[in-house]
């Protein structure tokens, strides 16, 4: 087995685990990537006593600056401060291992590079891609920048063999040379593997999943995502080529995507106690596997939070007294003619580092101006309840009640 280039702070690898790559077993009809659930960056900051209110304000200011963007600096709505799930992939020959977030909100693959500047301390505690250790590396050199709500990454493009779920493709990916300290210093993942559409990719790069589809090795042109609600067991799983019945019950209900080249669908309202409170005239929603929370326009969230009796603790972060949780009402999201209902157990976070008297809600305000927004985001808090299938062949998203 090959290893990724060890960070220069070798001792810190104890905290982040080994960089040794092992391929998952070929399960026949499906190809699987097992996911591990981790504390989010926000949780890690809270554990260390860091006031995260300022980070929320920074995210809010970022969304206010959003515009149509351009091909060299695309806008990605995912806020990795709250991302909790990652899986392993291999890059190079022999493969170097990286822990990545599988993110339907973006379309590029990037990992930190050995060419990362020593000034960027966040690189020091992650596995670094070393092109000199790979016999299949091909130089590209095109520079790129990707802006996220929680920072931006810069680097250059390279080409190498990438192995995902036992499938190997020739892939152009990003070697990141500028990785911001906040938030990536405390990230348990090394990089991001975008599962979005080609239109979302920086630099005209063909996404990993499209290269996999071109090989014709999958039974269906779909992938599905399961996030476990039990943190003591398997964190989750990405299934390439289909959906696994052991993770859901009943049948899938499908909703066609509403925007070509994006995992975006229409929502017909958000209701509490059978009353539609917001999005009465319909609104757009992105199903984002890289996001943890459910986000929506600030004005809509505040109305929803007032109904729940929640208070705004910091910028767009809401809490309730923990003794209120059992009496909080259900929240329903109306998609494709059906109501997808979350109970308080689904939308209240278990925060072992926070105030024992206050419980954080997995709902955030997110103001995105036109033409990108306004938009809602359904992240892991929703996907944990509803097993989700992303169907590229039919341009639709399917939901089924998770087991």
Swiss-Prot record:
Q: Which residues cross the membrane?
A: none
Q: Which GO terms describe its molecular function?
A: aspartic-type endopeptidase activity
Q: Subcellular localization, per the record?
A: Secreted; Membrane
Give the GO cellular component terms, alphabetically.
extracellular space; membrane
Record comment: activity regulation = Interaction with ATP6AP2 results in a 5-fold increased efficiency in angiotensinogen processing.
Q: Where this protein primarily resides, as one coarse class?
A: secreted
Matches recorded under SUPFAM superfamilies: Acid proteases (SSF50630)
**Glycosylation positions in this chain:** 70, 140
Name under which the protein is recorded: Renin
| Organism from which the protein derives | Canis lupus familiaris
């Amino acid at each position: 087995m090959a290893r990724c280039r060890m960070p220069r702070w070798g001792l810190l690898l104890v905290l982040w685990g080994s960089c040794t790559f092992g391929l998952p077993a070929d399960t026949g009809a499906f190809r699987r990537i097992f996911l591990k659930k981790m504390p989010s960056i926000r949780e890690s900051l809270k554990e260390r006593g860091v006031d995260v209110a300022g980070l929320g304000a920074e995210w809010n200011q970022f969304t206010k600056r959003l515009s149509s963007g351009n091909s060299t600096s695309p806008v990605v709505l995912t806020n990795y401060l709250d991302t909790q799930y990652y899986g392993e992939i291999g890059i190079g020959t022999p493969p170097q291992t990286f822990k990545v977030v599988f993110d339907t909100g973006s379309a590029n693959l990037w990992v930190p590079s050995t060419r990362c500047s020593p000034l960027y301390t966040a690189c020091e505690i992650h596995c670094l891609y070393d092109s000199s250790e790979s016999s299949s590396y091909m130089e590209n050199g095109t520079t790129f920048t990707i802006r996220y709500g929680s920072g931006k990454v810069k680097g250059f493009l390279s080409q190498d063999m990438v192995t995902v779920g036992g499938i190997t493709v020739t892939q152009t990916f990003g070697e990141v040379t500028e990785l911001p300290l906040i938030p990536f210093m405390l990230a348990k993942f090394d990089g991001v593997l975008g599962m979005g559409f080609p239109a979302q990719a920086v630099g005209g790069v063909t996404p990993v999943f499209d290269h996999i589809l071109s090989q014709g090795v999958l039974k269906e042109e779909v992938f599905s995502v399961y996030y476990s609600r039990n943190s003591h067991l398997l964190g989750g799983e990405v299934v390439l080529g289909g959906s696994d019945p052991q993770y859901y019950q009943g049948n899938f209900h499908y909703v066609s995507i509403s925007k070509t080249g994006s995992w975006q669908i229409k929502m017909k309202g958000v209701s509490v106690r059978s009353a539609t409170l917001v999005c009465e005239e319909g609104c757009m929603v992105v199903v984002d596997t890289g996001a943890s929370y459910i986000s929506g326009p600030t004005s809509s969230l505040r109305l929803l939070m007032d109904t729940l009796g929640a208070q705004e603790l910091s910028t767009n972060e809401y809490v309730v007294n923990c003794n209120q949780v059992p009496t909080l009402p259900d929240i329903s999201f109306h998609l494709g003619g059906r109501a997808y209902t979350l109970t308080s157990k689904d939308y209240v976070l278990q925060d072992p580092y926070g105030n024992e008297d206050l419980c954080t809600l997995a709902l955030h305000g997110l103001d995105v101006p036109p033409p990108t927004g306004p938009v809602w985001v359904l992240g892991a808090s929703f996907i944990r309840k509803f097993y989700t299938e992303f169907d590229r062949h039919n341009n639709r998203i399917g939901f089924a009640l998770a087991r």
